[in-house]
């Protein structure tokens, strides 16, 4: 019995995984989970149009906590075309879904299906897509129980588009900052 092949990639690993799709036959990879992928949306879209890409299901995990890194990526890595944007803001392809892990509606939906992920506690983090409590358990469910997590259901129930860039950084703090607290 042949086991399904899945890919989990973080940051630039997503670009490597997507670049490999052109060399693979249809059906070679079942699910790809991209954790705050450092890749242009246009390049991801093109990779998902290859024979292997068309048969894979792509989960674009993002968070506005990664905004600074996406901004730097767009300034330091040559874009495929003028105005190209990093994939963290989402992109529309039939076999892909974007999940924003700093979106309360997304976290509520996932929790309702049994994947409880902690709310973000940082404004800037390139690693929260796998260090935040609950994320690794969710990815395990995506890969080991795909029937419980159909891509089409996620596409239909998750907010799209994701929040605008810098929305997390510019958000007012939910707790008073220590320097502004009254002392006795």
What kind of feature is each model-predicted range?
Residues 1-91, 164-174, 181-183:
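Serine-dependent carboxylesterase/thioesterase catalytic core
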Residues 69-184:
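C-terminal catalytic-base region of ester-bond hydrolases, centering on the histidine
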């Amino acid at each position: 019995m042949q086991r399904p092949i899945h890919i989990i990639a973080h940051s630039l690993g997503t670009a490597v995984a997507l670049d490999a799709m052109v060399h693979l036959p249809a059906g070679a990879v079942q699910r790809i989970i991209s954790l705050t992928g450092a890749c242009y949306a246009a390049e991801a879209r093109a990779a998902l149009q290859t024979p292997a890409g068309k048969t894979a299901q792509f989960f674009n995990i993002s968070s506005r906590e990664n905004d600074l890194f996406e901004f730097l990526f767009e300034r330091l890595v040559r874009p495929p075309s003028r105005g190209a944007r990093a994939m963290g803001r989402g992109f529309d392809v039939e076999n892909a879904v974007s999940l924003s892990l700093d979106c309360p509606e997304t976290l509520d939906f996932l929790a309702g299906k049994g994947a409880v992920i902690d709310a973000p506690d940082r404004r800037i983090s390139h690693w929260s897509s796998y260090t935040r409590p609950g994320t690794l358990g969710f990815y395990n469910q995506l890969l080991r129980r795909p029937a419980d997590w159909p891509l089409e259901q996620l596409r239909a129930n998750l907010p799209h588009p994701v929040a605008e860039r810098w929305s997390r950084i510019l958000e007012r703090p939910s707790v008073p900052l220590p320097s502004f607290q009254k002392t006795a």
